[in-house]
């Protein structure tokens, strides 16, 4: 072997990568990948341009249908004796009721237990006759007929039950905002008396988009 061949062979040997010279992926690399995935999902959500029925006090979320938004109202049941009932009709703000022909697709109820909550309640939403006085007897019959879904929410040691929302689909009924006067949220306190400061119900009514004012109130 002449000198030039020896020099070329030496260079080739030097070009070979050393075993183990590449470092293993660090934890910071893994964290960066996770962050990138989260940002990608966030960008897709923002790009969709649709409101999301979401709230930190309940598990999971539902994205509004295209062309729809939602209006939320809050209900705080009064004290309910053990084995007794409570009912409250859905009263949306006047600014929403003005568009009474806009369709309603879904009603979602989110049960938010306050720190003192230690009871078991059943919650549902029902269409009730205008003549109904939402008496104990009337509400009891509506819970018993099985005509609408019921959420059973009970005390958990952690203070938060895994499932604390009820979704009621009205799409097939062609209900509109004006019909919401005919619906009521019903509560049954099963095993214990429910105190006034134990529970809050967030009711989200998903409906077709309505015009919004471009002028700030005076």
From Swiss-Prot:
Bias (Basic residues): 11-21
Residue numbers spanned by region Disordered: 1-30
InterPro entries according to UniProt: Cucumovirus_coat, Cucumovirus_coat_Asu_sf
Location of this chain's protein in the cell: Virion
Keyword annotations: Acetylation, Capsid protein, Ribonucleoprotein, RNA-binding, T=3 icosahedral capsid protein, Viral nucleoprotein, Virion
Superkingdom to which the source organism belongs: Viruses
Pfam families referenced in this protein's UniProt entry, alphabetically: Cucumo_coat (PF00760)
Main location: virion
One Gene Ontology CC term in the entry: ribonucleoprotein complex
Segments traversing the membrane: none
Residue positions, PTM N-acetylmethionine: 1
GO molecular function per UniProt: RNA binding; structural molecule activity
Entry note about domains: The N-terminal arginine-rich stretch does not seem to be the major RNA-binding region that allows formation of an infectious ribonucleoprotein complex.
Family as reported in the entry's similarity comment: Belongs to the cucumovirus capsid protein family.
Stated role: Capsid protein. Probably binds RNA and plays a role in packaging.
Name recorded for this polypeptide: Capsid protein
Source organism per UniProt: Cucumber mosaic virus (strain Iizuka)
């Amino acid at each position: 072997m002449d000198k030039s061949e020896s020099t070329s062979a030496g260079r080739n040997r030097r070009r070979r990568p050393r075993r183990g010279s590449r470092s293993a992926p660090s934890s910071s690399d893994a964290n960066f990948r996770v962050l990138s995935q989260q940002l990608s999902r966030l960008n897709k959500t923002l790009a969709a341009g649709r409101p999301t029925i979401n709230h930190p006090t309940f598990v999971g979320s539902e994205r509004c249908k295209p062309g729809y938004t939602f209006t939320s109202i809050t209900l705080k049941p009064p004290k309910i004796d053990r084995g007794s009932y409570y009912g409250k009709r859905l009263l949306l703000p006047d600014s929403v009721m003005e568009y009474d022909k806009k369709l309603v697709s879904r009603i979602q109820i989110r049960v938010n237990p306050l720190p003192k909550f230690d009871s078991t309640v059943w919650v549902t939403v029902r269409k009730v006759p205008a003549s109904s006085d939402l008496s104990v007897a009337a509400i009891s019959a509506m819970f018993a007929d099985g005509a609408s879904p019921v959420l059973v929410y009970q005390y958990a040691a952690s203070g938060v039950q895994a499932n604390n929302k009820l979704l009621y689909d009205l799409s097939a009924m062609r209900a509109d905002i004006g019909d919401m006067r005919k619906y009521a949220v019903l509560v049954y306190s099963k095993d214990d008396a429910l105190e006034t400061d134990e529970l809050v119900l967030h009711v989200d009514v998903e409906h077709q988009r309505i015009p919004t004012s471009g002028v700030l109130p005076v």
